[in-house]
Amino acid sequence: MFRIAPVQTEEEKREVTSSLGIPSRDGAFVYAMRDMEDGHLLGGSQFDIAKDGGTLFDLRPAPGIEDFEAMFILGRATLDFIDRTGTHLCRAAKDAGEERLLRAVGFRPSEDGGYLC
């Protein structure tokens, strides 16, 4: 079992993004997916919300973790949060995550090489 929760502190944000091998973006939100028994990081997402839509910067598993279903749930939880803010458009950079996962979560390729949802 795992738990997905928003990161609450800058210290935890740096820990999560560093563990995932991604840069920590100023002002971005981060969700961490952790094992419920031992708190081990399983994956994370980093995103932003603006008036013109949300942006998914990263949807990454932790090194050595290969659990497509868990990553799918993390991706959908991230998009659900963005949607609940009233922002119904979301973009993702072409390198935001594995293409198969981004498509499964609901993104489709856009003309600029990234993805739209």
Label the predicted regions:
Residues 1-26:
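Short amphipathic alpha-helix that is part of the acyltransferase structural core
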Residues 95-112:
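Conserved active-site alpha-helix within GNAT-family acetyltransferase domains
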